[in-house]
Amino acid sequence: MSESLDLSLEGVERRSLAEFTEQAYLNYSMYVIMDRALPHIGDGLKPVQRRIVYAMSELGLDADSKHKKSARTVGDVLGKFHPHGDSACYEAMVLMAQPFSYRYPLVDGQGNWGAPDDPKSFAAMRYTEARLSRYSEVLLSELGQGTVDWVPNFDGTLDEPAVLPARLPNLLLNGTTGIAVGMATDVPPHNLREVASACVRLLDQPGATVAELCEHVPGPDFPTEAEIITPRADLQKVYETGRGSVRMRAVYRVEDGDIVIHALPHQVSGSKVLEQIAGQMQAKKLPMVADLRDESDHENPTRIVIIPRSNRVDVEELMTHLFATTDLETSYRVNLNIIGLDGKPQVKDLRQLLSEWLQFRIGTVRRRLQFRLDKVERRLHLLDGLLIAFLNLDEVIHIIRTEDQPKAVLMERFELSEVQADYILDTRLRQLARLEEMKIRGEQEELLKEQKRLQTLLGSEAKLKKLVREELIKDAETYGDDRRSPIVARAEARALSETELMPTEPVTVVLSEKGWVRCAKGHDIDAAGLSYKAGDGFKAAAPGRSNQYAVFIDSTGRSYSLPAHSLPSARGQGEPLSGRLTPPPGASFECVLLPDDDALFVIASDAGYGFVVKGEDLQAKNKAGKALLSLPNGSAVVAPRPVRDVEQDWLAAVTTEGRLLLFKVSDLPQLGKGKGNKIIGIPGERVASREEYLTDLAVLPAGATLVLQAGKRTLSLKGDDLEHYKGERGRRGNKLPRGFQRVDSLLVDIPPQD
């Protein structure tokens, strides 16, 4: 027989899983945001950093003390204030000690605290020693003066400061990074003098705009001599919005032809940069670099030497390529997301940030002055009682010695307060007997003057701000230094293309009748004398440079291009173009050339139509090429002819009927593709039936001689001889003399220049 179990839910809180999960996640998020990842605007520190600095001050590890083992500090921090992992705590401490990580280090370390090349190469905490740096006084000097609120530590046995009373806006000076839940912060470091100057400007001119503050704070200042190349207008926009990015670039100089990089961007590893450059060299993407060395040492923390292959290498172009392809140029995110005085995280612009910090600073100074005033007034009150005791010394001593309750009698007899009576009773009789009226009255006068000064300061907002201003200027003189990261206007870095990276050697590209291609070094190549496969032979050749594109034009008028350096060597018989390009079925490759992008060519069909085209328009990006020349029915492509001067050059066209026509090249249109305009008049039906068509074209510079070849016979035409054949573009042309009715080709003889 089963018994029913009655479950009692008395004293048990019932909540839905959704509600509980939501609340738990929210609590965790708030903890990470408020107590771990984001800094406070007052001192610019995260809780772990604040606890390390405070614990070190409590251990007496100020800038004038001896260094103590880091493990001692970490143990104190964990045991008293920060119950988390020791490695994370020590790493936070290391970061504050590294002069290449912090613009103004808070910890002065002794031992191995890491290197710029490898910041995490620091020794274990049992080996290193530390004390606070001189700059930490900015955060700690006013701590015991009633300036900040105190909160219980994690177990309630000790108190710790909720925020440190920073005399300077440390948040901007050292910057910070942090990733919370749903938000992050990235505050770059700044120059102390510049930020202090902006604070003074804001005190003098509360309505100052961000643009006006940027006159004092032009940009971040990292702990490296690398250049900030972000334009000033963009930097101002970052400060106006609280978001953006800052770009840094390495600094180099040329020594005896070698490139020496002597400053790297913030947190960039020299060894990683070396790996990146070496990787490009191994991949043969840096043919202009002969060698690479790392000469960094203790005297020169950064010295990377790049040795160019020759003195003809453009150093600026090479470095621009390296800036674009390696960490020699790096971008840093800026996100001024911080916990304000209201305890809420918010992205602030520069003016909001400085205004709120000044509000914090003025409040801190007011609390410091009030604390001192209270102390002065307490002392004056005690001195009043002490003076009464001195003036009635014998009676006071008699009361103390004879009365059972001397405190009550003293208070009643001399109208003393309880505090005054306690102070007199706590003073030894021997000291009471030694009291001097002049000393008491002298101390009273000094304290009364100080009381008046403090009351004046606390009673006037203007005088309080003036005091804050004076202290800012003094601290800037004491702890400030010159800017380390210059802000320089530089052109945007551009990576060199594969073609630009190739060495510019003279080459000749050879095309065979069957469409095989190869590339020979040099221009003095007997292309027709090269060995060809059985049944194949020489078709065309074009001289150029190895960093150019070879352009191929097929029998359908389509153009294709391939990098010349990628073509097979002429030591063999090459490879078929059809393996790398996809021409239409039945098409054959007719000609090849290596054009410069801005060079001009006349391209035509043997139907007598053509146009002028730029070299860059001959190139095609895809394997299928591009439609370049539209061919009328039955016509073929005539190889392009280079043009030197469009305005001065003449175009000569000859047909199979022995007709020759000359006209100015400028009469032809410049197109990117198409059929073009009529060059010489040939009836369309005669072209289609191949009864008559264009035999050849030639471009004649001024003063050149036109040489006609008909079999073994040649005819040279120059000067007045050519006038007979000049006419309007598109005419039929004039008949050539007997024996030259069938011209094979046109050649141009250019006289030598004086």
UniProtKB/Swiss-Prot annotation:
Organism (species): Pseudomonas aeruginosa (strain ATCC 15692 / DSM 22644 / CIP 104116 / JCM 14847 / LMG 12228 / 1C / PRS 101 / PAO1)
InterPro entries documented for this protein: GyrA/parC_rep (IPR006691), Gyrase/topoIV_suA_C (IPR035516), Topo_IIA-like_dom_sf (IPR013760), Topo_IIA_A/C_ab (IPR013758), Topo_IIA_A_a_sf (IPR013757), Topo_IIA_dom_A (IPR002205), TopoIV_A_Gneg (IPR005742), Type_II_DNA_Topoisomerases (IPR050220)
Function: Topoisomerase IV is essential for chromosome segregation. It relaxes supercoiled DNA. Performs the decatenation events required during the replication of a circular DNA molecule.
Organism domain of life: Bacteria
Residues with site note (Interaction with DNA): K46, H82, H84
Name of the molecule in the record: DNA topoisomerase 4 subunit A
Any one GO CC term of the record: DNA topoisomerase type II (double strand cut, ATP-hydrolyzing) complex
Disulfide bonds: none
UniProt-annotated location(s): Cell membrane
